[in-house]
Structure formats: C-alpha cells, structure tokens
Amino acid sequence: MLTLFKKGKPKGGSVDDRNSSYRESDPMLVWGTAPPAYLDVYHDERDKNELQFNTKSYLIQANLEVISSKPIERTTEMLKVLDVMVDEYDGSYLSKALIITSYLTIGTHLRRMMSSVKNNHKYNNGFTEVIEFTGTAEIHPRDQEIKYNKYLMTSHMGEPVSISYQFSGKKSKRRGKNILDAYNLELGNGSKPPDLKDLLESYEINLCYNLKGEHGFTNLVKS
C-alpha cells in the first residue's frame, strides 16, 4: 500500500512513463508532494445559511485496485470506470461522504503497477492516515468504526474490468490532514485534479461553503 502523503517518486510506472502524448492533456494521476491552493469556491445559496459544520478525525485505511484487459490511459477514462459505484454502492448512507470521497481520492491518484501477464493492466493505490473530514453532523458515523468492502465488475473498451475497494474508518483523537488536501494533491504534470464537487453529485453528496467560510460535506436530500 502506498502512503497518501509519501514524498519523492513512488514505485511503479505511471501512464506518463509509457505514453508521453498525454502529459499535457489529461494524464493518469500520480501522487504530488503538496496540495494546491483552493481556487474554486462552491456556494449553495439556498442552504448555506443553515449549515453547521464540524470537523472530526478518523484513522482511515483504504485501498483500491483496478484490473483491466485494456490499458486505461486517461483520468477521465478511469473515472468513467469507477463510476459503476454510483449504482452499486450499498454501504452506509449517512457516512457515504467518508467512504466515497476516499474512493475518489484514491481513484484519481492510481498508479500503474508492473505486470508480467499479457493484457493485464493493474492500477493500485491506498493510504493509512489520520484524516479530517468537515461537514454536517449527519456525515459523521455514530459507531466507533465503520467498514466497507466492495468488489465490482464493469467494462472498458468492451473488455472486462474488476474493481476491488476496501475501506475502514476509526474515530481518532489525533489531528490529521484534511481529505480535501489529499484529493487536491497536484497531478503528475502539475495540474489540478477534476472538480470533486461534480464527481460527488452523482452520489447525492454536496460539497459547499457555509456562511463562516467552512468547506464541508452534506448529504443531499432525496427527492
């Protein structure tokens, strides 16, 4: 498992190593060394007057592995593959922000792993870190620990893809990095990752600011 905040060049090849034509357009992501400043401000004028956020820490252990018969060259392609979770998620509704944001954080920062098997393209990453999540009270689990494991099958370019995701979160008294800092780690080419707010909407999770300027998660009300 690779650490979320590991400095230096991680082991294993990246997509950039094999296909330089994607370096300036949309490369598969690799771990950066520092988060960029938040430049995009998300507002929800209808609700932010009522939003009360609190921040809690969790010891998060999460790992994601994707195995595809065809290479997945672009971040947008990987996100399309991972999007199968939208329909297949069957974990906690209230704590979905913790589980899914960790899933997307790793998913946008996967590493291509070396493989000696033909037509077997493996991508993996994960972390064990104390992570802080900010949001409304309902996103924070009442239980001391929550776990979620999921195995999914989907396709890419007409060929099968398997996805294996393991997540556990345990309440911690320690301070840690905010999950938004983790998600916003710069890409291998120095650019920013895709807009997390847009990715979360399909999961009925909102990322917004309240009147105090706090940036946090809320669960969208089902219509």
Swiss-Prot record:
Q: Name one GO cellular component term.
A: membrane
To which species is this protein native?
A: Bovine ephemeral fever virus (strain BB7721)
Q: Under what name is this protein listed?
A: Matrix protein
What InterPro entries has UniProt attached to this entry?
A: Vesiculo_matrix
Feature: compositional bias, Basic and acidic residues: 14-23
Q: Which miscellaneous remark does the UniProt record hold?
A: Most abundant protein in the virion.
Q: Where in the cell is it found?
A: Virion membrane; Host endomembrane system
Basic residues bias locations: 1-10
Keywords per UniProt = Apoptosis, Host membrane, Membrane, Viral envelope protein, Viral matrix protein, Virion
Name which cysteines form disulfide bonds: none
What quaternary arrangement does the UniProt entry report? Homomultimer. Interacts with nucleoprotein and with the cytoplasmic domain of glycoprotein.
Q: What does this protein do?
A: Plays a major role in assembly and budding of virion. Completely covers the ribonucleoprotein coil and keep it in condensed bullet-shaped form. Inhibits viral transcription and stimulates replication.
The beginning of the lineage is: Viruses, Riboviria, Orthornavirae, Negarnaviricota, Haploviricotina
Gene Ontology molecular-function annotations? structural constituent of virion
Q: What topology in the membrane does the UniProt record assign?
A: Peripheral membrane protein
| Disordered as annotated region, ranges | 1-23
> What span is annotated as the signal peptide, if there is one?
none
